[in-house]
């Protein structure tokens, strides 16, 4: 079992490494299992490839009890959440609203603007805000919810509330089921024992996958989850309607009788060339020099 320090360091290392990605209006997430690193470290993270400096970042500490039991958190776009206990302390990265105005929603109410990633006192780590886009036909059946949870609010809620990665997964998927999601997202949730990856591409459907140590993947704003067995409950947690929504939309790919779905093919709007390009780089097929990067 890897130590908390190694995992936490890995999260930051990935974020810093990916910062050399060429400028683009996009985001890129990366996971490297412990079997594929020299020192047995699990690595995951995400970079904001905006190509501009319009969203300055703050790395800060949210003190224990910053949110009180029973307090209602009012997010950027109408999502609300009632905290079940005094919040855990955590360190995180968020957008800078020291001017008093949120750079994301222009709101002046008390909320955390675009909290992207962090680690709480229980050793739970979250890397969120990797935007995903569902098929129009699937969204017609299960549309996004205007006041559902938005990707930038996930880190705030989970790090405040969850004492383990598994509890974080349970909390997030419960929110998807009940309040719904305002948009699609890919989210890493990890602790000293395991790392999970959660995707949603419509308002209420989702899949959470326990990530093996032998896998590397990158996610450039497209679904990274392919064919999965929904009966593999040790490693897969999915919404009860994961198959039926896709069937109603006419987008289902898989074997319904065997409870198997190709998640990407059924829900992802479209793939892009950034996926093979990134994997070719990680696999050593392509190499890059400093001259390949724009100033």
Give residue ranges: language-model regions:
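Sec/Tat signal peptide C-region and signal peptidase I cleavage site
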Residues: 21-26
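A contiguous strand-loop segment
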Residues: 27-150, 171-295
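Hydrophobic core
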Residues: 12, 16-20
């Amino acid at each position: 079992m890897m130590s908390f320090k190694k995992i936490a360091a890995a999260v930051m290392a990935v974020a810093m490494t990916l910062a050399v990605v060429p400028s683009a209006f996009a985001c890129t997430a990366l996971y490297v299992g412990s079997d594929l690193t020299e020192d047995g470290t699990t690595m995951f993270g995400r970079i904001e490839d905006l190509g501009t400096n319009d969203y300055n970042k703050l790395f800060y500490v949210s003190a224990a009890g910053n949110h009180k039991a029973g307090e209602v958190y009012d997010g950027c776009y109408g999502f609300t959440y009632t905290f079940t206990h005094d919040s855990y302390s955590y360190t995180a990265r968020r957008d800078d609203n020291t001017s008093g105005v949120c750079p994301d929603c222009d709101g002046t109410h008390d909320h955390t603007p675009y909290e992207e990633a962090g680690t709480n006192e229980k050793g739970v780590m979250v890397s969120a805000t990797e935007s995903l886009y569902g098929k129009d036909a699937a969204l017609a059946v299960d549309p996004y919810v205007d006041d559902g949870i938005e990707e930038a609010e996930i880190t705030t809620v989970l790090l405040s509330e969850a004492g383990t990665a598994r509890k974080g997964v349970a909390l997030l998927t419960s929110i998807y089921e009940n309040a719904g999601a305002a948009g699609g997202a890919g989210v890493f949730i990890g602790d000293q024992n395991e790392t999970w990856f959660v995707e949603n591409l419509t308002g209420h459907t989702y899949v959470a996958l326990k990530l093996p140590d032998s896998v590397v993947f990158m996610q450039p704003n497209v679904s990274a989850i392919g064919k999965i067995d929904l009966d593999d409950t040790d490693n897969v947690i999915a919404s009860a309607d994961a198959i039926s929504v896709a069937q109603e939309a006419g987008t289902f790919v898989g074997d319904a009788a065997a409870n198997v779905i190709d998640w990407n093919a059924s829900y992802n709007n479209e793939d892009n060339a950034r996926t093979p390009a990134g994997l070719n780089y990680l696999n050593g097929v392509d190499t890059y020099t400093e001259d390949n990067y724009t100033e």
